[in-house]
Amino acid sequence: MKNFMDKNFLLQTETAQELYHNHAAKMPIIDYHCHLNPQMVADDYRFKSLTEIWLGGDHYKWRAMRSNGVDECFCTGKETSDWEKFEKWAETVPYTFRNPLYHWTHLELKTAFGIDKVLNPKTAREIYDECNEKLSSQEYSARGMMRRYHVETVCTTDDPIDSLEYHIRTRESGFEIKMLPTWRPDKVMAVEVPSDFRTYIEKLSEISEITISDYNDMILALRKRHDYFAEQGCKLSDHGIEEFYAEDYTEGEIKTIFNKIYGGSELTKEEVLKFKSAMLIVLGEMDWEKGWTQQFHYGAIRNNNSRMFKQLGPDTGFDSIGEFATAKAMSKFLDRLNSKGKLTKTILYNLNPCANEVIATMIGNFQDGSIPGKIQFGSGWWFLDQKDGMERQLNALSLLGLLSRFVGMLTDSRSFLSYPRHEYFRRTLCNLLGCDVENGEIPLSEMERVCQMVEDISYFNAKNFFHF
């Protein structure tokens, strides 16, 4: 019987162990998509407690606690203390066997705080106090955490109207780790509620210093902000969409639709789809002009619990996997850009695992030989960011594409304690490849190439792909 989470955790063969310990483990981290708060990095924020850094904003843990019968006040409530919240989390942890939260929890305790104890109600107070004592020191600040995990580059997620002042301040402070912005223009496509859209466009007008009275003005304002993001080092965009949009439209129609929504009138479903379709193309062309990589996270049904959405807002643990027939629209969208010669580097992330093979085959349609892996199948996202989800994504990409050209893992996280997800991914990758070698499916004579492949997927592919 193996010990829990020892040095060979998830590594079932000697070859897997060699690949991980001698190659994957030493690679720096490039976290090219995350949701860290840039101000915390700029301020080198010091966390007040383990609860703040671990439970604050972590909807994964909140979902588990709710499922375990924990009252909402211990998840998101203002009236309960940090210790009370942590105590309820510690009571929940023993019920998370086989959930990735169990592994993440103990991997984070071990790698960040050097704690090998299992978290449960009996150990909760001891672990809480030990972690809080360490968090009070400078080496456990926001920047200290990034250094601890050998992070080289992070890309945050930022709205076109964000000032990026914290990215600038961080860079000018001389901080050795790169923090770059990512262009996330979702709100310019959110035309379902006229008043919300107009409010957003007015903010875009203000920060761009361009008076917006029609569709062309809006595009000019977006281009100005796009240029500004590029000046601040941005190399990626990101789009959170339910599904792909590829309706037929004319520019005249889109101008009319803009006037209608900006004037306060609700759009028909057809008009909404046409506008979203047009914006995806325009934004894709902007990214192509700059040589950026566009990312698409699709397939989530968000804010399912309307009562809790009204109470807590978005991103609080009430989203789930959607079921959308989007392959044709995805193909049509990519083909439109490709036909114009304006399809930039692209990463596709699905939330429904049923689409693994869809994406793994779709990306092969638009590889053009200009660079290795120009169109990428993104790492297992959100609910698929776990051992089984990672393995299924890696296997689909291996069978239908080129795993060796994969740009690898990202945290997609708001937490400074989420970097062990890179370790988890690397261990999973090394275990798959190690088993293949020992099963005679990859020749032992090619071991040097396999070792390089592990280092590439862990670090070098992303470094070269994004030009960091």
From Swiss-Prot:
This is Uronate isomerase. Keywords: Isomerase. Its EC number is 5.3.1.12. One of its GO terms (biological process) is D-galacturonate catabolic process. It comes from Bacteroides fragilis (strain ATCC 25285 / DSM 2151 / CCUG 4856 / JCM 11019 / LMG 10263 / NCTC 9343 / Onslow / VPI 2553 / EN-2). The gene is uxaC. GO terms for molecular function: glucuronate isomerase activity. It catalyses: D-glucuronate = D-fructuronate; aldehydo-D-galacturonate = keto-D-tagaturonate. Belongs to the metallo-dependent hydrolases superfamily. Uronate isomerase family. It comes from the Bacteria. InterPro entries: Metal_Hydrolase, Uronate_isomerase.
